[in-house]
C-alpha cells in the first residue's frame, strides 16, 4: 500500500507512507480469500493511521491484466461516443450489459477521434469496492497492474541520469515477467515470459531482447524475482548496463539517494496506482 500527495507540478509527488501486509490465504473459497484481503488492508491502514498518515482519501486498486480488456477505437466525426464505447465494451468482453463495467477516454494518439476503452466484469470491481470500504477507503479508480507498474517506473526514470535516452523496464509478477523498451513518450512491450519457464529469461537477456539501452529499471516482489533464479545484480551483469531496482522510499518531488529499502521493487504497483490517483 502506498499513500501519496501532490503539491503543484506533476513531478512534485510526496510519499506519505508505505506499508506491506501479507494476505495469509492464497487458496480456498473466494469469499474467504477476499475476507483475508480485507483484513490485511485494514491492518495496513491501521498502522499507517497510527503513524499519522491519512488514509481516508480516495483510493485506487488494480485488476490483473487478464481480468481487463482494452481496445482503441477511431470514432472521428461520431456524436454517439458513449454509446459506441459501450457497444465496444460488450463486444471485446463478451459480457452481458448488466455484468460489465467500462470506461473510456480520449486516447491522445495521432488521430484526434481515437478513444481508449477498458472493460472488466462488474463483480470484480464490486469486490474491490467492498474490500476498500471495509478499510475506510473510498475506491474511485480501477487500473491495470502492468499500466500501474509502467507509470511508476517511468516516473522513477526522471530521477536517473542514465535514463535520459532509451531505457528498459522489467516487471516480475505472479504470471511471469514483462519487459518494455522506453524512449521518450514511447513504451513498447518487448518481452513477455511465463513464470513456468524461468530458464528463458537469461537467454532472452543475452539475445538483447530489450535492445540497446542505457539502464534497466526492475520492479516486482522478491519472491517473483527469485523464481527466475536471478537477482538485480545478475541482470546487470548479463546486460552490461546499469540496473535500478524500484525504490520510492523518501521521495518528496526531488531526486534523492535510494534508501535500499527491503522489498522496495514490490511497491511499484501500489506507487503507480497512487500516482494515477493524485494525478487525476
Annotate the PLM regions.
Residues 1-280:
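Hydrophobic/aromatic-enriched cytosolic interaction surfaces used to assemble or bind macromolecules
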